[in-house]
Amino acid sequence: MASVTSLTASVHQRLADALSAALPEAGSADPLLRRSDRADFQANGILALAKKAKANPRDLATQVVARVESGEVIKDIEVSGPGFLNITITDQAITRNLAARYEDGERLGVPLAEHPGTTVIDYAQPNVAKEMHVGHLRSAVIGDAVVQILEFTGENVVRRHHIGDWGTQFGMLIQYLIEHPHELDHKGAAEVSGEEAMSNLNRLYKAARTLFDSDEEFKTRARRRVVDLQAGEPETLAMWQKFVDESKIYFYSVFDKLDLEIRDPDVVGESGYNDMLDETCRLLEESGVAVRSDGALCVFFDDVKGPDGNPVPLIVKKSDGGYGYAATDLSAIRDRVFNLKANSLIYVVDARQSLHFKMVFETARRAGWLNDDVQAQQLAFGTVLGKDGKPFKTREGETIRLVDLLDEAIDRATAVVREKAEKVGLSEQEIEENGRYVGIGAVKYADLSTSAVRDYKFDLDQMVSLNGDTSVYLQYAYARIRSIFGKAGDRTPLAHPELELAPAERALGLHLDRFGETLDEVAAEYAPHKLAAYLYQLASLYTTFYDQCPVIKPAPAQEVAENRLFLCDLTARTLHQGMALLGIRTPERL
């Protein structure tokens, strides 16, 4: 495995060295290198440096140009405007760099982080005994993409799925199951489907709720059962575990449909921190971070006030002795920092919970659990909207079941795949498999191509379109490239650095070389949408290249054909790897 220095980094270093030579007092000055439509790069840093040194910017720019060691990388540098530098790269440097990436297998020359840390990512957090709905989609999809991207950079990533598996509602459910012990029995099937598991839970929940609302004696028994659950009474815990296990059958079936890997050891729900709650509260109170207010243990903040102007506290422990969500979240922070040794905590959680997490993180900082060496941040996401721009609901105003949404996406995508299947020669099995890949990819990409914090419209017509910024467009671009190699005969992909590149080849090559630096930015900002934008631009540049630069017909010269096949293959591999990091599959034939 050999990492490859990007052309951007090579040019940046040469300019920085020349700047230091021309203006020693500037130290290691930043040339502020940017992509440009006037050349391959433009450097804008000289203007500010000249102003600081009371020098003429054009004169300083001319001195810098004279000191640049161009080598085989820089073809031309010109001074433009008040002191900008326009830099053009040699064709040879572009092809050599791409050849080095090509030789590096799946990593494509992308270096591993020099100083990897440990990041805990909290994402995909459904609730036990409750159906997953469209609101659960974004945390799962965004979180999984961030996990894949960080792991690719070499970070040690610990996944956590903080499922809602505790609370007073379990008293009602457990009591009903004790009185109706066969409600969660499976009808002789060796393997229960997720749909059947959820059907069992739904039926039991509705029956328990009806009884709870109509029978005072049952309500009393259910409330006593909550006390038993919190005390760890064995029979009660055994019944509670049945709900958790049945729910996991359902959860895992939905995540499997979403093509997400969820591992059982990574599922640590609210109950996983029960043994820490008392100590968390004690530590907060003893340190003075939390104080008693009307019998409750609270943390106050100067900048958090209610409509009446009075402070709104974070309630860690209620006046009746019960623990709030904050106690669980703060205990989870302690576990992740001190037991898992995390440097970074990422919470992929709805933006509507931002105030809660702001207060939780500030409390943890005051307690000394978070500091400059251990950071926590919420990767907040917006709402999924319908075509009308309103929160996505059924016509009856109900929340949409996630599994129904995914099934519809797969059905629509399968119809799109089937339209072209005969031309490509796909079997029925391939049509169904590709339909799943395209449908689930469409749902994921629509989410991931939007900045997480923004709301986005769920429009299946647009999502499965072959035109525009969709995963289907990218998947078809990949499949189209793979099909070229079936027509290439005895010609193979081979880099030819000695060849002059056409404008479309240069544009594609420069973009391919930016894959690593794009991933650096994406990983640093937890911004999968920037990777999606890179891949869409890659597919668009490839389309232009394919239209303008014949690969097979009319047949170009041998060396030109080999070099273009090399660009095709590297584009396909970059698309494949980039889409995989977003959790999207790329079928070989579409």
From Swiss-Prot:
SUPFAM superfamilies: Anticodon-binding domain of a subclass of class I aminoacyl-tRNA synthetases, Arginyl-tRNA synthetase (ArgRS), N-terminal 'additional' domain, Nucleotidylyl transferase. It is found in: Cytoplasm. Keywords: Aminoacyl-tRNA synthetase, ATP-binding, Cytoplasm, Ligase, Nucleotide-binding, Protein biosynthesis. Its EC number is 6.1.1.19. It is an enzyme of class 6 (ligase). Signal peptide: none annotated. It catalyses: tRNA(Arg) + L-arginine + ATP = L-arginyl-tRNA(Arg) + AMP + diphosphate. InterPro entries: aa-tRNA-synth_I_CS, Arg-tRNA-ligase, Arg-tRNA-synth_N, Arg-tRNA-synth_N_sf, ArgRS_core, DALR_anticod-bd, Rossmann-like_a/b/a_fold, tRNAsynth_Ia_anticodon-bd. Its main location: cytoplasm. One of its GO terms (cellular component) is cytoplasm. Pfam families: Arg_tRNA_synt_N (PF03485), DALR_1 (PF05746), tRNA-synt_1d (PF00750). The keyword DNA-binding does not apply. GO terms for biological process: arginyl-tRNA aminoacylation. It comes from the Bacteria. GO terms for molecular function: arginine-tRNA ligase activity; ATP binding. A motif ('HIGH' region) lies at residues 126-136. Belongs to the class-I aminoacyl-tRNA synthetase family. Monomer. This is Arginine--tRNA ligase. It comes from Streptomyces avermitilis (strain ATCC 31267 / DSM 46492 / JCM 5070 / NBRC 14893 / NCIMB 12804 / NRRL 8165 / MA-4680). The lineage of its organism: Bacteria, Bacillati, Actinomycetota, Actinomycetes, Kitasatosporales.
